[in-house]
Amino acid sequence: MFPISETSPVQFRPPLPDLCDTVVIGGGVIGVMTAWHLAKAGQTVVLCEKGRIAGEQSSRNWGWVRQQGRDPAELPIAMEANRIWQDLAKECGEDLGFRQTGVLYLANKAGDMAGFENWLQFAKAHQLDTKLLSKAEVSAMLPSARADWPGGMITPSDGRAE
């Protein structure tokens, strides 16, 4: 089970060092990863957060680790972030709540499929595992759904993190 929750006490571990190379302000996902990589590079880092590390805004962003639907210029960065998330739990020896569950976009109308087909060319150019789903495939995937979607797009390597 992921070790951080609303019941986990906010802790401060004094004393702060007299000197450090870098102070990172903000203990959300960006601040934590910045501090982590700077420390791995040999810098002495102090991470400051007003409340709970990884328990403020980062805990409410839906947690998507998503490549699908990204701007083509962002896609290589999103793919690298996905790779980092896959390796991070092993590297730090903790369950970070990352689950590779895939991300599914559903078409509300037939015209939405054209947009999905457009984006698929970028996914293919980067060897991403995105694929289009027919109406029948979506219905089989979501048999209890009340809506009748004309199709969808899924990237199985996408996921979520807590």
Spans of features found by a protein language model:
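Residue-level detector of anion-binding/catalytic polar loops
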Residues: 19, 44, 129
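Glycine-rich Rossmann-fold phosphate-binding loop(s) that bind the pyrophosphate
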Residues: 26-28, 50
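Extreme N-terminal leader/targeting segments of oxidoreductases
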Residues: 1-22, 37-41
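Dinucleotide-binding Rossmann-like beta1-alpha1 core, especially the glycine-rich loop
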Residues: 62-144, 150
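A short small-residue
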Residues: 5, 9, 59-68
